[in-house]
């Protein structure tokens, strides 16, 4: 990668918001293949009194990784709850700096009928330059009832890489 490696990405510092989708769906954790739609995002934000702002880091808590990574890693790896293609378009319209989740791909897997698998990556990253943050440890924020925080990430500057393990910080 010579043009778009992660060494070109500046440190990310901004307002983070966390949508607790387990609270929205009234479940301990979302299920494999369970979609997060545009309406779900709007309703969860409204119930948490979150008003999106340009440049936000928008994160989702599904409970999927907290519940399934250790108890059933094969199931955890076979699919996940996540955003739909339409939800990715809606999120892009909010002009966030980044979108992420506590899942390994952010998007629903398998894709819902009519959606293309991982097309949200194209919508967010390729078409809109919105960074994607996967397998984010958002559980502690939920347990502390934190919806809004300062998000700080100084990622490694490794030339030619397109992804990496990161350790962002949420300050509240």
Could you say what each language-model-derived stretch is?
Residues 1-172:
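Active-/binding-site microenvironments in catalytic and ligand-binding cores
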